[in-house]
């Protein structure tokens, strides 16, 4: 028991708990954010969460009873729907690093909102039990969270990070291209425009070039 107590109060465990709690709180208030803010913050907190999880000391369960959970189906669905609404048309993405790819030669469609909700469920259940302050259950919740990091939510985190990176940087490129295409009308060179059949700049009584050609003034109005 003493060894388990030392593990749960390890510096790396405390740092992971801190980041994990902030991650959960961040997702819970995400529906009030702009998508750009949500994406930017996610791209910062997800790598940190992965880093802290990878630095956890080895931990094994010591109890036999199932641990309490916090995330119900209703809580999960509310969060997923909120995140899906926030991401809108940028929610879906293609992924190849999933077990189902063994049976398919095509990329599989996943969603950022569902992956984040899955990660949230593991992390929130861990935080809920850990904050109860009972050494044995704290230890076991840490062990389960660590195991699930390796087999479940760690890979989902990496996949989601790639998708969010694509949303942020490819979206900015698309917006820049659209902005360049909009443009505005630029009159032709005076001499070139005066070669058009409808131009009367070369009539004997024409004074167009005293102040520049005005052949296309009507087009600019």
Regions of interest found by a model, annotated:
Residues 2, 14-73:
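N-terminal interaction modules that seed assembly of large macromolecular complexes
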Residues 2-14, 221:
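Eukaryotic N-terminal accessory cofactor-binding modules
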Residues 3, 107, 122-221:
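Acidic, proline/glycine-rich low-complexity IDRs
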Residues 11, 15-22, 41-48, 52, ...:
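Charged, amphipathic alpha-helical oligomerization/scaffolding segments
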Residues 52-58, 87-98:
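Short, compositionally biased low-complexity segments
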Residues 67, 95-107, 132, 136:
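Short, charged/polar, low-complexity loop and linker segments
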